[in-house]
Amino acid sequence: GGFYKTGPGGLLHTLQLVGHAGENLPPYAVAKQELPELAVRAAVASAQQKEPLVQILEGNTHHAKFCRRVLGRVLSYAASLIPAVTESPQDIDDAMKLGFNWQRGPFELMDAIGHSKMGELLEEAGLKVPDILQLDQPFYQVDGSALTVRHADTKYKPFSLPAGVIRFQMKRRTMTPILENEAASLFVLNGFAEGVNDLRLVEFHSKANALTDASMEIVAAVSEDHGSGIIIHNDAQHFSAGVDLNAFRNYIERKDWNGIDAFLKRFQEAVCKLKYTPVPVIGAPSGLAAGGGFEVLAHCDKLVVHTNSIMGLVESAVGVVPGGGGIKETYLRWFNKTHSWEDAAWNTWMNLGYAATGSSPELSAKLQYFLEDRDETVMNRDRLLTRAITLIGQMQDNYSAPQKPILKFAENSLFEKMSDFMQTGVERGNFMPHDKVVAMTIAGVMIDTDGQNSEATENILYARERDAFIKLAKTDCTYERISSMLDYGAPVRN
């Protein structure tokens, strides 16, 4: 406990009060960045697709005891509401998830903890074990291909949802992926809509859904085994926070520039194959879709977006450029909007240089990240996947893969205009010196800087993105930004 403020360099400082017995308050000092051991264990477990709750409840530290007391009391109260308030635990779980934005309801949490462990928690807190917990059986279990819920009468009854609602995190319990690894899975969807079958669904499920080589292996694989349509979707709080920065820090520390180039090339090849797959491809995100996460969506035919979605390319904040087709796709979108390669380059440059994001689909539309004449929004997150499946069915009959575009580089005169803009900003204190380096590197991807190549292809833009990324990765300032983001949660300004 204590008071916090941000000091020089963006470091968090704290005035520690816990255990202070004197009259004079101690001075501010740099806050401890270390997380409690059980929080670290829980984060590691979550990243490994294991149950994190088990980790925060084990041990005799004051953190673990606090977690046991709080969870014990909250979950005990929830269990006591059966059957007084409802016969079905699902009703309470749904109320907490829909009404209070819980990721899992209390009865789902009790299943995750284990009912015998729950009994220990309640006894430790001096609480009576509710009747519904006396029977050591899970509240949710799979019966054949159906998910069922244990009611107050101890009988298992079908897990029920309103018509048109699909919660994939629940439905996936009854499904077996045809391909999976630690970061993503590939599922076949059948029977979710009349006449729409043999679909493929790609689900990311790494920590924060950060994209890795393993994630992109599944994206590449679905382009080969595409069925009758592809949906990119998951039910996590955030669709994807972008590419795993830890991987890039490791590459930089080893000076493995070929490794960075190979990683980016694999990413680009995966999204390029996705774009030209001979079946409809729909992205159905909710929450944050940033950086590489948005680059995957940018190569889809159409987006069905939850209204509470944030989209954008934020790479410049950590000193790099979008390296998975993000510059290329944004440049194309702005050209289709403005019909001018110079205007397209300027608008793309402003988007990426400011690391702009749209905090709603409407605001994303101003950045051309959400295309109002093509993409759709869905207000109820539970109906996102249903709408995506329906749209696949509507697109199937007359679908043909997009034609590969011919691009042009913007004229060299624009580069000088951009340089003057950045230099003025640096002199005024609006930008830091490395902001200009990053911005001009972004500009160099889209501008014919040598006056030799006016026309371009997607592959040329992909190559320029990789070169620009590696050029910046070799700078000390970019390494400092990436390290600051990973170590302190915000990039240093330099």
Regions found by a protein language model. Give the residues of each.
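Extended, composition-driven regions rather than compact fold-specific motifs
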Residues: 241-243
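N-terminal glycine-rich phosphate-binding loop for ADP-containing cofactors
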Residues: 1-230, 235-237, 246-279, 286-289, ...
